[in-house]
C-alpha cells in the first residue's frame, strides 16, 4: 500500500471471499496507518474450511474482493480477483503432486506464442480465450508461454479452463554484459511475478532468458528474486539441465529419447531434482537447413506443415 497523498492516512484493509455461487465464505480486515509518501505491506490471514480445490478437471475459482477504507469506512481503493486454492509440489523421483496427491494424468502440452493471423500479437481477449479453449479441448494440460509473459486475458482463460502454465521471462538468445541489462531483466522478473503470482494456473516459473548463455551468478540471482516476490510454498523454477547455474533450480528441462543425444539425454539422475521434457521429439539438425522432421521449413504453403505433421506421426 502506497500513500501518494499530501497527508497521513489511517484506515484498514478489508477482504471478502465469495464462492462461485456468490456466497460469502470468509472475510476480515486489518487497520493500518501511513505517513504521506510512505509505503508498506499489510498481511491479512484467511482460513477457508473445506475449500473447493482448483485442478485441471475441476478448475474451481473463488472471487476475492479487497478494499482500502478510510476511518469513516469510505472505500478509497480496491480490486476484485478470481483466485483458486491449490497446492503444487515437485518431488524429484516421486514426480509431480497436486493438492497433496500424485498427479495421475499425462502432462501433455505445447509452447504458445501470442500471435494470430493478420493482427500479430494484438489479440483480443476473446482470441486469447479461444486459443486456451482449443488447446484444452485437444487434451493439453500444460502451456509454456514462449518466450514472454502472455496477456492477462490468456492467464485468466487458463485459470478458468484448467491449464497449467509455465511463465517465462521475456528474452531470447541475447545477453549484454553491461550491468544495466541484468538489472532490467531482474525488474522484468519482479513485475512478472507480481502480476501473475495469484493465478492458480501458474505451474512453474522460467525466470531465465530462453536459449541464452548467461553468467552463473545471474541464474542464482533470478531464483532468489523469484522467492523474494513469492515467499511462500509451492513456488518452483525451471531451467535447461545444461544451463549455467542449473544447480540452483529444482526443475530441469531435458529432451530424452528425441534423437539429439548430448547432455540433454541425462544419464545420471538426481533423485532430488524433477526432470521435465519441455520439447518432445524436437529433432533439430543443424539449425540452418530447416529439414528437421519436427520443425516447419520456412517456405510458403501447407507442404512444410504436412511434412512436420508426418514427422511427428512417425516419432
Where are these regions (language model features)?
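Secreted/periplasmic carbohydrate-active enzymes, especially glycoside hydrolases
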Residues: 1-157, 162-165, 187-188, 203-204, ...
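Substrate-binding/catalytic cleft of secreted carbohydrate-active enzymes
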Residues: 129-134, 142-315
Amino acid at each position: 500500500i502506497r500513500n501518494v497523498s499530501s497527508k497521513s492516512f489511517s484506515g484498514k484493509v478489508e477482504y471478502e471471499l465469495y464462492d462461485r455461487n456468490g456466497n460469502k465464505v470468509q472475510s476480515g480486515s486489518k487497520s493500518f496507518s501511513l505517513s504521506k509518501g510512505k509505503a508498506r505491506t499489510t498481511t491479512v490471514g484467511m482460513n477457508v474450511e473445506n475449500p473447493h480445490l482448483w485442478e485441471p478437471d475441476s478448475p474451481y475459482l473463488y472471487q476475492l474482493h479487497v478494499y482500502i477504507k478510510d476511518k469513516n469506512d469510505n472505500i478509497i481503493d480496491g480490486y476484485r480477483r478470481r483466485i483458486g486454492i491449490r497446492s503444487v509440489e515437485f518431488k524429484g523421483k516421486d514426480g509431480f503432486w497436486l493438492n497433496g496427491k500424485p498427479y495421475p494424468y499425462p502432462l501433455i502440452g505445447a509452447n504458445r506464442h501470442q500471435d494470430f493471423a493478420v493482427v500479430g500479437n494484438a489479440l483480443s481477449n476473446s482470441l486469447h480465450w479461444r486459443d486456451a479453449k482449443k488447446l484444452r479441448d485437444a487434451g493439453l494440460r500444460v502451456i509454456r508461454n514462449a518466450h514472454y509473459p502472455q496477456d492477462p486475458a490468456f492467464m485468466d482463460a487458463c485459470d478458468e479452463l484448467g491449464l497449467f502454465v509455465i511463465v517465462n521471462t521475456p528474452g531470447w538468445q541475447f545477453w549484454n554484459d553491461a550491468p544495466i541489462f541484468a538489472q532490467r531483466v531482474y525488474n522484468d522478473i519482479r513485475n512478472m511475478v507480481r502480476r501473475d503470482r495469484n493465478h492458480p494456473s501458474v505451474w512453474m516459473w522460467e525466470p531465465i532468458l530462453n536459449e541464452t548463455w548467461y553468467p552463473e551468478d545471474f541464474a542464482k540471482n533470478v531464483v532468489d528474486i523469484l522467492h523474494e516476490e513469492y515467499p511462500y510454498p509451492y513456488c518452483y523454477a525451471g531451467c535447461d539441465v545444461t544451463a549455467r547455474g542449473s544447480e540452483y533450480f529444482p526443475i530441469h528441462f531435458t529432451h530424452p529419447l528425441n534423437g539429439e543425444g548430448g547432455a540433454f539425454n541425462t544419464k545420471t539422475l538426481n533423485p532430488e531434482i524433477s526432470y521435465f521434457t519441455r520439447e518432445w521429439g524436437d529433432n533439430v539438425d543443424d539449425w540452418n537447413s530447416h529439414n528437421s522432421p519436427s520443425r516447419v521449413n520456412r517456405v510458403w504453403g501447407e507442404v512444410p506443415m504436412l511434412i512436420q505433421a508426418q514427422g511427428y506421426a512417425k516419432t
